[in-house]
Amino acid sequence: MRERNRSALHEKLCQILGSRNVYHDPPATIKMNYPCIVYKRDSVSPRKADNISFIKWYPYSVQVISKDPDFPLFDTFLDNFDYGSEGAPFVADNLHHSNFTIFT
């Protein structure tokens, strides 16, 4: 189930970005092409009642990375998901990063 969800998420992220520059937890040795999306799974967030899990959210940490500080996806990324939040953006190595947490 989890792998199927990740595969579907990967395809959705490719569609949102409009390219295949989407990387799941890439090793440091990979050369990424920009703009890109990098994502990894976070710990599961179960919702409980009477000590029984009745729903599990699968959170993913997502970074949208671009050389362009005005890359439009920075402002519209969360419009593509029902549940998510935005973290603090930052610049490293002249690349602009916007951080998001999404739930599947």
Residue locations for each model-derived region?
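Long, highly charged amphipathic alpha-helices
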Residues: 8, 12, 72-77
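Short, cysteine-centered beta-strand-loop-beta hairpins and adjacent loop/turn segments enriched
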Residues: 46-47, 68
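Short intrinsically disordered coil segments
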Residues: 52-57, 77-80
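Loop/helix-junction capping segments adjacent to catalytic residues or to phosphate/diphosphate-binding pockets
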Residues: 3, 71-72
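Acidic-leaning, charged glycine-interspersed low-complexity segments
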Residues: 75-104
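Short, solvent-exposed beta-strand/turn "edge" segments of beta-rich domains on protein surfaces
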Residues: 49-53, 91-92
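Oligomerization/assembly interface segments of phage tail-like spikes and tubes
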Residues: 54-68, 96-104
